[in-house]
């Protein structure tokens, strides 16, 4: 799967999750308007600083315009560094750089002919009013992007954000590893089916259940409340 799926991590929060995927062996391009934030990613292989950006300080409009102005170069970076069948854009919905640049970048890349999914983070209730306004606007834009593949949502209200990031990446990678690690004479899930699932438009849910048969797994998932997992997806 590592040659089929890659990630564009936008902003500081996106970078935190991107690093976990890179540690798993996936290609990740880190994009930020803040050079200082990029400098904290010491072991990152691919980093790109958007010109004229010195951070966006929760200003979504500024982040969107910076992406529009520099899209040709951003697209070239993606094409040369992490060309893959499916690319997920990772960003926080409540910040500035990620919240503004994430949906805009996803939309422009889809228009450019690429298959794009999203992974985004919603703020916890204690964060600022501005963060929640940004998150609302971010999701309003995400829902209007035609052709967007699956979208995963991490809810920071479900626990420590760094722990949630780690659990999410572990669960997501376990899902990607199903064709390699789980084989049965009763039937298998192959890589193409995993990719097709992730390409499907709409929100996605990742949860953990143990069972011996497929019917038991399906029943367990149906009985799992959405609030159970740190991932809540439409």
Annotate each language-model stretch with its function.
Residues 1-234:
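Tubulin/FtsZ superfamily GTPase core signature
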């Amino acid at each position: 799967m590592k040659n089929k799926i890659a990630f564009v991590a936008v902003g500081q929060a996106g970078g935190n999750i991107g690093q976990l995927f890179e540690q798993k062996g996936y290609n990740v391009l880190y994009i930020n308007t803040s050079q200082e934030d990029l400098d904290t990613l010491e072991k990152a292989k691919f980093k790109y600083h958007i010109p004229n950006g010195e951070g966006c300080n929760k200003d979504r409009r500024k982040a969107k315009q910076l992406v529009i102005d520099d899209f040709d170069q951003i697209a070239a970076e993606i094409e040369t560094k992490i060309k893959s069948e499916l690319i997920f854009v990772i960003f926080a919905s409540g910040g500035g750089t990620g919240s503004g640049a994430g949906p805009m970048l996803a939309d422009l890349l889809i228009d450019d002919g690429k298959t794009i999914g999203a992974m985004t983070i919603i703020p916890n209730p204690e964060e600022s009013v501005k963060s929640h306004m940004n998150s609302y606007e971010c999701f309003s834009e995400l829902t209007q992007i035609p052709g967007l593949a699956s979208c995963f949502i991490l809810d920071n209200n479900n626990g420590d954000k760094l722990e949630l990031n780690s659990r999410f990446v572990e669960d997501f990678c376990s899902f990607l590893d199903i064709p390699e690690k789980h084989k049965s004479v009763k039937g298998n899930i192959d890589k193409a089916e995993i990719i097709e699932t992730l390409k499907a438009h709409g929100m996605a849910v990742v949860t953990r259940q143990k069972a011996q048969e497929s019917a038991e797994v399906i029943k367990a998932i149906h009985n799992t409340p959405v609030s159970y997992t740190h991932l809540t997806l439409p």
